Amino acid sequence: MIIEKILGNLHELPASEAGAFAGLHQEKVVLPSAQLVKRIQRVTTDHGKELGIRLPAGSGDLRDGDILHVAETNMIVISVLPTDVLVVAPRSIHEMGVVAHSLGNRHLQAQFFDAGSEYAADVMVCQYDHTVEDYLKHVGVPYERQERVMPVPFRHAEHSH
């Protein structure tokens, strides 16, 4: 089976549509975050079914909860594996700027969340890297290492001087 479009996302369905999917069995395509940026790939569900994903150019990244296929009693959805991340909680705008500058010099991508997010605080999140953890310990910036399903995949940052 070739998947050429995303039918919706389980986490964003309006209440009026959510009921239609409530009784369906969820077959999952479990992917690491790095695979979410590929619009053409071959995947296998947790039931051993092989699928091809071929999304049109300009399609957004795959996300946790994306619905790939719906049949009578079954649906196939994307399930994203947690990513090993550092959740950095700077105490001031100065501390945030210094840490963000250091991460930028290392070409690491960061995602930013505010107090209204699932983190319930103003934080920046980057993929785990032992040198970043050592740096944060050295400068005394509060952080926590966590396993998280990120809403947006981290992308490799191309760079040249």
Swiss-Prot record:
GO CC terms: cytoplasm
Alphabetized GO MF terms: nickel cation binding; unfolded protein binding
One example of a Gene Ontology biological process annotation: urea metabolic process
Compartment annotation: Cytoplasm
Domain of life: Bacteria
Main location: cytoplasm
Alphabetically ordered keywords of this record: Chaperone, Cytoplasm, Nickel, Nickel insertion
HAMAP family: UreE
Similarity remark: Belongs to the UreE family.
UniProt-recorded name of the protein: Urease accessory protein UreE
The species this protein was found in: Arthrobacter sp. (strain FB24)
Source organism phylogeny: Bacteria, Bacillati, Actinomycetota, Actinomycetes, Micrococcales
